[in-house]
Swiss-Prot record:
The reaction(s) this protein catalyses: uridine(38/39/40) in tRNA = pseudouridine(38/39/40) in tRNA
Gene: truA
E.C. number: 5.4.99.12
Function: Formation of pseudouridine at positions 38, 39 and 40 in the anticodon stem and loop of transfer RNAs.
Principal EC category: isomerase
Record: active site: 53
Membership in a protein family: Belongs to the tRNA pseudouridine synthase TruA family.
One term of GO molecular function: RNA binding
Name listed for the protein in its UniProt record: tRNA pseudouridine synthase A
Protein's GO biological process: tRNA pseudouridine synthesis
Length: 249
């Protein structure tokens, strides 16, 4: 068997998430159907680096799969790109060593979250940015977001009921900038892994801080007390993008 690594992007609006699930459309299922056709009807299973939720987009998701024979990477990329649905794009396909695993090889992820702060909102971006129509102070957001950097127990920012026991993660970069052309806020988070709904909960909290309904110090309190009820609401999935995955050499 020959192992291939692919980088893909997708519009998450019409997907119930990346991972295959019964009675719902998933990115995994669409790609596996195409690979099975290419593989003369023999089933092919893909393994993604991250499992994005329903409505979440990807600019640089990574996956791997095995095929019984060696193929030209660009020809395989072109075949997958043209035979998968229009809301999936294959950016690159390359042959990798048999021990490469998209999920378990050590890597870091970068996510972006787009918030439309226009009044009125941009209706063309309703599936691709979360609208926030209330006043915001960028300086408060900038002060608060840096407190998320470093190694912390992010229990207070994860969804209740998650099965993951170790909730300690390292965020290497957390920043926000204002995109004047689109009237958007762009949040960027990089780290060694993120918990279920962690980024959306962090953004929801930061927006309340920017709106002066929570103090800047609330971030430290949530981290210290590990209490989800102290954090803000969960921001919508439509603003979240898996931007990039970087593997250690």
């Amino acid at each position: 068997m020959t192992r291939y690594k692919a980088i893909i992007s997708y519009d998450g609006h019409d997907f119930a998430g990346f991972q295959r699930q019964p009675h719902a459309r998933s990115v995994q299922e669409e790609i596996e159907k195409t690979l099975t056709r290419i593989n003369k009807g023999q089933p092919v299973v893909i393994h993604g680096a991250g499992r994005t939720d329903s409505g979440v987009h990807a600019l640089g998701q990574v996956l791997h799969f095995d095929l019984p024979e060696e193929r030209d990477g660009e020809k395989l990329r072109f075949a997958l790109d043209t035979q998968t649905p229009e809301d999936i794009d294959f950016i690159s396909v390359e042959q990798v060593s048999d021990d490469f695993h998209s999920r378990y090889n050590k890597h870091s992820k970068t996510y972006e979250f787009l918030v439309d702060i226009g009044r009125p909102k941009n209706p063309m971006m309703r599936h691709y940015a979360t609208h926030y129509p209330y006043p915001l102070e960028l300086s408060l957001l900038e002060e608060a977001i840096t407190q998320l950097e470093g190694t912390h127990d992010f229990t207070g920012f994860t969804a209740s009921g998650t099965s993951v026991e170790d909730k300690v993660r390292t965020i290497t970069e957390a920043k926000v900038r204002y995109d004047a052309e689109r009237n958007f806020l762009v949040f960027t988070f990089s780290g060694n892994g993120f918990l279920y709904k962690q980024i959306r909960n962090m953004v929801g909290t930061l927006l309340k801080i920017g709106n002066k309904r929570m103090p800047v110090e609330q971030i430290q309190r949530i981290l210290a007390e590990k209490d989800r009820h102290l954090a803000g609401p969960t921001a919508g999935p439509n603003g979240l993008y898996l931007k990039e995955i970087r593997y250690e050499e």
